[in-house]
Swiss-Prot record:
SUPFAM superfamilies: VC0467-like. It holds the Pfam family DUF179. The lineage of its organism: Bacteria, Pseudomonadati, Pseudomonadota, Alphaproteobacteria, Sphingomonadales. GO terms for cellular component: cytosol. This is UPF0301 protein ZMO0349. It comes from Zymomonas mobilis subsp. mobilis (strain ATCC 31821 / ZM4 / CP4).
Amino acid sequence: MVTDPCPELSGLLLLALPNMRDVEFQKAVIALCAFNEKGALGLNIGRIIPDVTLHSLMHQLGIQPGLVPDRPVHDGGPCEPQRGMVLHSRDWHSPDSMMVGQDWALTCTLDVLHALSRGEGPQHWLVALGYAGWGAGQLDQEMKQADWFLSKVDDQLLFSCPAENRWQQGYQQAGVDFYRLATKIGQA
């Protein structure tokens, strides 16, 4: 198991602020998985890839779905869109799993898909292709520019809420009316 070097930010959500200029990230809901002096990595859990499901992905990889239910695959972000990642509860892990915050793990190896197909995988999980990545200081700068709102997340929002509802639900859970957010943080 690998631990995250900056656990105080990993395991949180980045919610795109309503004034997000980057079209790729408008209404994005990023599960922040790693954050350190070299940069940050997260998965966009607010968007699915049309016509791609877990079963179709597993068949492409030569893995029989077995006992795992079929679910949509998330568009995790623009970096390495062919790379699969599974964000999941900590009740299952492999030696290659990275612990994310206090409650999740991120596994990027096929062993998690094999475990899911046998009914031996994590209880809660979601699959994504690609990820959102930031270089050193880049996410810090975007947060200063009021592109992102940082929030806590619960398992229901992460694993049960439909992807298309997560942005609005994330703000509601934080007690924030996103329509009233100021577009310039710290300015009167």
